[in-house]
Amino acid sequence: GRLRYVIAGAEKLSESVRAAWIERFGIRVLEGYGASECAPVIAVNTPMVARSGSVGRLLPCIEHVLDPVPGLDAPAGQARGALRIKAPNVMKGYLRYENPGVIEAPEHEGDPGWYATGDIVRIDEDGFVHIEGRMKRFAKIAGEMVSLDRVEQLAIQASPHGQHAVLSRPDAARGEALVLFTTDSLLDRARLVEAVQRHGGSELWVARDIRFMAALPVLGTGKTNYLELKKLL
């Protein structure tokens, strides 16, 4: 066939989709990462240079800074933080309907031209970028930053056939607490703890508040409607 390259972005590529493409078409899906404000690619795996679980290396000519996030440490030899970039592909700014003809530069720190992605990433010792989640999709529990997306992945590992979504709510003892919404009525803390032990992680990733739903609310794109779930907290 003529199909040579398949690149996935927008959300994390599941292992089941990756395996299905290899089995059916013999093609490895290459995962990438970007933003509309960056026209739109920031990092991508290539056929010759790829690492599973990452979104590849930053494109050439992209300067980057990882701003420290309190409660979030990096493994030895790696870097972790909130990603800011400066590059030729970063837009000049936004055109607002209510202010025609005026370019509103993106928020930045330091020199103009920087763009704050709003994403927390980890860059490993070989320069591969690993997306850990949106800043707004982290909770600070007992002083430690916990990725709500990573907690969702944990739920998927414990219950592959269910649908799961995680939010956080204020907690007097720990600052914030996890709330897991799931369509699997049999999913409990014991199965989540087992998944942590099997795949690695922290006890802080195990939700104490687990709520069963017949179906999770979704947007027109098929993604989870977190705004609707927040109304249930």
Outline where the language-model segments fall:
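Beta-strand->loop->alpha-helix junctions that form or flank phosphate-binding loops
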Residues: L30-E37, V41, G56-L58, L167-P170, ...
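Gly/Ser/Thr-rich phosphate-binding loop
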Residues: G1-R51, E63, P70
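AMP-binding/adenylate-forming catalytic core of the ANL superfamily
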Residues: A87, K92-G93, G113, G118-W205, ...
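Short proline/glycine- and acidic-rich turn/helix-capping motifs at secondary-structure junctions
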Residues: A172-A173, D209-T221
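Active-site glycine-centered loops adjacent to acidic/histidine catalytic or metal-binding residues
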Residues: A10, G34, G56, D119, ...
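A structural signal for short hydrophobic beta-strand segments in well-ordered beta-sheet cores
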Residues: H64-L66, G101-H108, D119-I123, V166
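Short beta-strand-to-turn element immediately C-terminal to the catalytic PLP-Schiff-base lysine
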Residues: I42-T46, D67, K86, Y97, ...
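Conserved ATP/PPi-binding loop(s) of AMP-dependent carboxylate-activating enzymes
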Residues: R57-C61, L72-E107, E144-V146
